[in-house]
């Protein structure tokens, strides 16, 4: 059994890799930072020396690299974890457009391409799991993080649509979306925000995500508070949520 994880050098991606290693999966770890990837590999093999780990240094923010990654792997992948992603904080008219384009390419385009390519293979075998890492942000408008929230909404809607297509084919391929709230990862530093709300540990989120994914759960929402927030987002009008979200985001400055 083999799993491919993007964004595997830190945070949720790293900890999902660790959880899958404990379950005996061979791993292909993908990220930009080769030093961190080597450290993750070393740490995992210290505790799980009965598996194989391959590391690939790659930036998935370009379509060409995503296609090259698929061709380079050329392997029988049982689980795909699309975790690579980051956020940009600030007023939409003032945030850096080049950074936002990189965000869109990483959070949206890479997920789209890798899901399509590996899903085609999984459908031929009629088995496999795909976990797309979204966010609770994907269910609501997010002023002051407009591009990030919108990118996660894309992941949610894409995954929901694919799930229905798989259902109508009676496919055994399972697709899940992970929708956490604030998590203790490097995300805050990259997005240049300071979450005031209590964050879950990335280890807890990863363990919860893997358990639920392997059960075939579609919406994976860790934490009682975030489950409650998702319920509220279903019943409260978006304009009210946007006003509330702005006040919450403003406190992160």
Regions found by a protein language model. Give the residues of each.
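Active-site helix of classical SDR
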Residues: 115, 151
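The beta1-alpha1 cofactor-binding region of Rossmann-like NAD(H)/NADP(H)-dependent oxidoreductases
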Residues: 34-35, 56-68, 97
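Conserved glycine-rich Rossmann-like NAD(P)H-binding loop of the short-chain dehydrogenase/reductase
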Residues: 23-39
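C-terminal helical subdomain
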Residues: 177, 194-230
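Conserved glycine-rich cofactor-binding loop
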Residues: 9-10
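Residue(s) in the substrate-gating loop at a strand-loop-helix junction
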Residues: 135
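Substrate-binding pocket helix/loop in short-chain dehydrogenase/reductase
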Residues: 91-92, 99-104
